[in-house]
């Protein structure tokens, strides 16, 4: 996938100072750090195991290192990357945003660029070679991108984009309806 290749291009082009910021842990989580919770909380920890890979276990140290703190992005700010690295970072962002309907994607792409790359963070966990277990995330004020490929040969990608304010399981009707909807509708 273009997104995975761009992630490798970034991490493998970083100098030592950049690497010390970008690599959050030498072990990748088995799956998303945010798991499959309906709304991302203030702090999220990856699961100890993935039911599909019970042999792949994380220690408490691994989980702590790979945790997501919503208000404190881990990794390196996009503004600390060189022009080529920034282009790869924006490619990742754009590819994930292109999963949205075009008007939504274009608005979010503009928003990322207008806010600036100092508000876009790239974090990596795991090995930095293809065909190995690895994970990266792109953390912005508005959304989170996660890509994990932790099966031993690195050949099974899971990826997600999550909106911090309008995420999985969000109840748009309840948030926007002036009165609670009754359990039983009159006359029905």
Describe every region a protein language model picked out.
Residues 1-188:
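A cross-kingdom marker for long, charged
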């Amino acid at each position: 996938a273009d997104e995975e290749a761009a992630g490798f291009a970034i991490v493998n082009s970083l100098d030592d100072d950049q690497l010390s910021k970008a690599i959050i842990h030498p072990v990748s989580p088995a799956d998303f750090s945010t798991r499959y919770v309906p709304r991302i909380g203030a702090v999220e920890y990856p699961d100890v195991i993935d039911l599909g890979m019970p042999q792949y276990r994380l220690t408490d140290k691994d989980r702590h290192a790979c945790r997501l703190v919503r208000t404190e992005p881990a990794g390196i700010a996009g503004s600390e990357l060189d022009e080529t690295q920034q282009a790869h970072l924006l490619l990742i962002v754009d590819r994930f945003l292109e999963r949205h309907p075009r008007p939504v994607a274009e608005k979010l792409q503009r928003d990322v660029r207008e806010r600036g790359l100092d508000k876009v963070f790239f974090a990596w966990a795991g090995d930095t070679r293809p065909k190995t277990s690895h994970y990266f995330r792109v953390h912005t004020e508005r959304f989170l991108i996660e890509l994990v490929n932790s099966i031993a040969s690195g050949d099974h990608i899971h990826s997600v984009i999550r909106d911090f304010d309008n995420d999985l399981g969000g109840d748009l009707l309840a948030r926007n309806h002036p009165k609670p909807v009754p359990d039983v509708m009159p006359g029905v």
